[in-house]
Structures are given as structure tokens and as C-alpha cells.
A protein has these predicted regions:
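Bacterial N-terminal signal peptides
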Residues: 1-11
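Extracellular carbohydrate-recognition regions
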Residues: 12-47, 129-136, 245
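Short carbohydrate-recognition loop motifs
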Residues: 52-74
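Extracellular/lumenal carbohydrate-interaction signature centered on repeated Trp-anchored short motifs
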Residues: 78-89, 182-185
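Short coil-to-beta strand junction motifs in C2/discoidin
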Residues: 107-114, 145, 228
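Extracellular/luminal beta-rich ligand-recognition
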Residues: 111, 121-169
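Extracellular beta-strand ligand-recognition surfaces/modules
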Residues: 114-116, 171-181, 185-223
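Extracellular beta-strand elements of beta-rich domains used
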Residues: 213, 232-235
């Protein structure tokens, strides 16, 4: 359960629980996203208010609408794509406003109106003592280790597109800025990213298997609010070799 890794890294001491109130997998948004036979589920973080996720039509598009009110949670899906089969990831989002106080390099201000989250396996013998301890804590809590690495695509207030931000809690979470500043607010933005190239840019090594995909809008650290719409998330070049766990 790679969501557990995010919970441990966020300072949570309990296991994330399934926070679903509806089956998100039956929505047109989920059916257009990668691996249509898998389940997109909403997961809460212990001690955190949950952001609200709901399917909607936005500007003629199928979308997942998200509202965060001093909250943080994720909609995610478990997948498996072997390193040799990694291709691209396609996603889109629309953001009406940035979080003015946010700074993803600071623990106390690490919020973002949009995040696309990719979780990976890897050579765990290379983990630092601190990261190994975090992984052991996750294993003790859940019976499963945290991901070896997590890559997030984010929209940053000031850092330039292409910047890599290391998570203030652990260097096994890194954020790649794909949008910056206010210039493209209030419009749909579409992306296709090379997973391998972006992982290598962020971590300086080749990726392991991709084991999870998620979307996340959070405003808990800044005690603020955020809204966003996400289009379907797709793995167009890897779909033939993926499998839901």
C-alpha cells in the first residue's frame, strides 16, 4: 500500500484508511483513465481532514473535481509497469487559483493545488538509514513497505518549470515542476510526460517498476483552501503491459 509511505512521511502514526463514499471506478473519468478494470479509490490520511473528490463535467470534459479546505487526501490506483515497459503518462488539469502561502520546499508550507503522483519500486539496500527506518515503520504498521521512490508532477508558485523540489521530510519523494506562476490559471492544460526521463532527472538513477498512480490536492499545512479539476490520467504507451494488483 504505497499510500502508507506518504502517510509515514507526513508524520502520521496510523494506517491510512479507505475513505471512499462512492465507487470512483464507475465514473466516466475513471473509465477513461489508465487500466479501466482497476479501482480508483479515495484514501484519507490519519489526523487530516479529507479533500473532497467528485466526478463532474467541466468545460465539456470529464473531470474529477477536488476541493481542499485545510485538508489532504488522495485518489489513487495500484498498477504494475515493469521498468522496461515504462512509457509516457498523460494528464490534464485546470486550476483557478494558486495557494499564496505554499512553498513545497518547506515542511510547514508543503501544499499544492494539483499533484500527479507516481510510486516506484527500487533497490531498497540503497536507502539511507533514515529512509530505511521510515520504511520499517510502514512495514510494522501495515505489513507492507513504503515505496522506494515517489515522483510528483506539481504546479509551483515561483520555481521555474523543470525545477526539482526535494520533499522536506524525505528525499525519496521528489516533485518535478511542470507549471509555474499565475500565467495559465483558469484554463485546461494538457501534458504528456516521459516517465523514465523525468524520474532520471529527479532522482539521478533509472526507475524501478511503477506501482501506483494518484491525484492529490492539499492545503493542510497552510490552513488554506484550494480547488482544481483533473482530466483522466492515462498510460498510453504502457497499457499493454500493465496489471492491476
Amino acid at each position: 500500500m504505497w499510500m502508507v509511505g506518504l502517510a509515514v512521511m507526513a508524520g502520521c502514526t496510523a494506517v491510512p484508511k479507505d475513505a471512499s463514499t462512492t465507487d470512483l471506478s464507475v465514473t466516466p473519468w475513471a473509465q477513461q483513465s489508465s487500466l479501466q478494470d482497476g479501482q480508483w479509490r479515495h484514501y484519507a490520511l490519519p489526523g487530516k481532514a479529507s479533500s473532497q473528490f467528485a466526478y463532474t463535467r467541466k468545460d465539456g470534459r470529464d473531470a474529477m473535481a477536488v476541493t481542499a479546505m485545510s485538508s489532504a487526501s488522495m485518489v489513487r490506483k495500484q498498477v504494475r509497469v515493469e521498468p522496461t515497459e515504462l512509457g509516457s503518462v498523460r494528464f490534464s488539469w485546470k486550476v483557478p487559483e494558486l495557494i499564496a502561502q505554499a512553498d513545497m520546499a518547506l515542511r510547514e508550507a508543503d501544499d499544492s493545488p494539483v499533484r500527479i503522483v507516481l510510486a516506484f519500486e527500487g533497490d531498497r539496500s540503497r536507502l539511507s538509514a533514515r529512509n530505511a527506518a521510515l520504511s520499517e515503520l510502514a512495514l510494522a504498521l501495515t505489513g507492507e513497505e513504503m515505496p522506494y521512490a515517489t515522483l510528483m508532477y506539481v504546479w509551483c508558485n515561483e520555481r521555474a518549470a523543470g525545477s526539482v523540489i526535494v520533499n522536506p521530510r524525505t528525499d525519496r519523494i521528489r516533485k518535478l515542476v511542470v507549471e509555474s506562476g499565475r500565467g495559465k490559471l483558469n484554463r485546461w492544460l494538457d501534458y504528456e510526460r516521459n516517465i523514465r526521463a523525468d524520474y532520471e532527472k529527479a532522482f539521478g538513477e533509472a526507475p524501478g517498476a511503477l506501482v501506483g498512480i494518484g491525484i492529490m490536492t492539499d492545503s493542510d499545512n497552510t490552513r488554506s483552501s484550494a480547488r482544481a479539476w483533473y482530466g483522466p490520467v492515462q498510460l498510453p504507451l504502457a497499457s499493454r503491459s500493465t496489471a492491476v494488483r
